[in-house]
């Protein structure tokens, strides 16, 4: 892509797409796990078919959305605050915001941006931002943009509220939507009732919940982030590189545990954290199969819980890689039914959300089926996130149908990114 080229996207007026038939009204309960991450997750999906042009893309997307919203009717409502002071959904049925748009080029002009996913300023143009929205309550749970390109392909850009869907639930919603577009029944109908995860009465906090601890920045990291431009990079970890990491770790561990320990250590080194800086690692563990009983198939809410390590930067950077990998392993092993229900009850008592000061938050989308959504134009040629929700986040991403590789996306201040890149050469 030539550096001088600028993607220009011309949007039409947004419309509201409501469920195709009457749906239940009233307040829809969101669990305490749904309260944790009040952010909009932005993703894009590029479709191109040799046998079907993009002329009807907007109408197909709109019609199938209207039909699938009958099953996922809370997504057509609006977020509100419940009488208990928590985020809930007012099931108004008013609909999802959908925007039709045209790009000034074929997709080849932005090939680098969409394949390396490290140019959020370009990708942001493919997802609609609700103008004037001051907070999460003023943004509909789902926002859709369909952008047609001159090459005959189109991009489906989505903004989805994390209070409504975690990654697994979002992929199941998208899959249901794509099945509807192809005239198929839903292979996994949604299970909408989130009261399964109500807090206990009375609440029982049985574990320390340091994931919510607010740490002090004594290393000047906040100033570094404000003084320097954030640079985004993606790093591909293929099977051979991942195997080398496991050998370096000198301990029995999963790919996730090894890679997480390695990246945590590398980021601490790149940011030049003081040895006595208290730091935190947060990552989401899927609790669907760990709850007792397990959550039902198709559970359409947040089934993830945050687990954590809290230590000092020196403990991570001055010890061998095996030490940080073992810390990650211990955090994974903490997550069971008792820990997750204790976290639910902790929020009920404190209303605390995880603090991100001196924290790295790792989110793995590596096992999410980004590439399998077929709305009638075949599977996406390429898909992925639009930027990162917070500067403290590292994303693990799938590499299309290659299940043995992981693409790592992060942003760091320019000087720190140079150091980080050097550490990635293993």
From Swiss-Prot:
Q: Top-level EC class, please?
A: transferase
Expression sites (tissue/organ): Expressed in the outermost circumference of mature roots, the endodermis of young roots and in the seed coat of developing seeds. Expressed in outer integument layer 1 of the seed coat.
Keywords, sorted A to Z: Acyltransferase, Cell wall biogenesis/degradation, Transferase
Report the EC number(s), separated by commas if there are several: 2.3.1.-
Entry-linked Gene3D superfamilies = Chloramphenicol acetyltransferase-like domain (3.30.559.10)
**MF annotations from Gene Ontology:** caffeoyl-CoA: alcohol caffeoyl transferase activity
| Gene Ontology biological process terms, A to Z | alkyl caffeate ester biosynthetic process; cell wall organization
- Could you list the residue ranges forming a coiled coil in this record? none
Q: Which Pfam families match?
A: Transferase
Gene Ontology CC terms? plastid
User: What is the official name of this protein in its record?
Assistant: Fatty alcohol:caffeoyl-CoA acyltransferase
- Name the encoding gene, please: FACT
